[in-house]
Amino acid sequence: NPTRTALETCLAGLEGGDFGLCFASGMAAIDTVLRLFSPGDHILAGNDVYGGTFRLFEVVLRPLGLDFTFVDSTDLASGAAGLRSNTRLIWLETPSNPLLGVVDLPGVAQLSSSNAVTGKRPLVAVDNTFATPYLQRPLELGADIVVHSATKYLGGHSDVVGGAVVVNDPDLHARLAFLQNAAGAVPGPQDCFLVLRGVKTLPVRMDRHA
């Protein structure tokens, strides 16, 4: 849909990314990212993630074979101790919802790149819902994947539900775009229009929030 394409392009630009994908909700976006991984893969996550994210990880995905460890994401030593040879993803929220924990993203990116435990670098995914790209652009700080619930500050008017993923890597984008199409959890044109409308006032609203 051209309106969805316009929103995907807009959000990718705001995040300083090359590719954007939009979804029917933030949880649909998160679920799509987690579908990149296979049974036996390990995901390291913050211990204060959004409750819906925790439920998806623990109640839905763990029984399907994904393994999760939750650590204090504000403590790099805790994160380093949680890495395993099969860690494929580091999942972060910063600020976290609802405790507003702040993560050292460049530090985590370095931890991922220099991980001596595994020969395969884990991807770093950041839920940027609370900061928005107005206050923080995780791709510029070393993240591979940025996720949003557009329902909150991007939409900004409490009248739309949506989600988004932004990446730079073309192969990663192709895999996520296939999953987006295969699962079909995409927003309708009106929802995309409402988020595009909301983005126009994002700087004014975030200035007042901050």
Regions found by a protein language model. Name each.
Residues 19-210:
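Conserved PLP-enzyme active-site core in the AAT-like
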